[in-house]
């Protein structure tokens, strides 16, 4: 889909072996990163976190936390080197949408971005700006795969078209 829109695409499957230096080079070269994952115990699977830990700690991605011993006004979390880049979190969940958005439901109306707040902060730490998150819900107990794929295609066109 993105290639059809004229974009170059690199894909990494974090459950397989990868070279952190090569992955960091991909991040440096990218205009945007899309993280696609299945929600797992209220967050991303451990393989995604492992990828973040091994790739985002490389010096070409972040140059510290942004603070300085000589400038007491420097703000924590501003040391990222990727300030011209964006990221997208795209996730699938077995929970229905109302579980995320309604106050009396499990996630207490926090929404997907509230649940994925730590991931958003990780990307902010390395300097990236968010695109709107995408979520496919109820994927096991009430799947609407074709409709979800159509929504995702329209979403990609909105963000990257």
PLM regions: where:
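Structural motif
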Residues: 17-25, 141-148
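A short, Lys/Arg-enriched amphipathic alpha-helix followed by its capping loop at the start of a domain
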Residues: 1-7, 122
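A short beta-strand-loop structural module common to alpha/beta enzyme folds
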Residues: 5-20, 134-137
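Hydrophobic/aromatic beta-strand patches that form the interior of the parallel beta-sheet core
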Residues: 10-12, 34, 88-90, 131-134
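Helix-loop-strand module that forms the ligand-binding subsite of alpha/beta enzymes
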Residues: 22-119
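Glycine-rich phosphate/pyrophosphate-binding loop and the adjoining helix
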Residues: 106-161
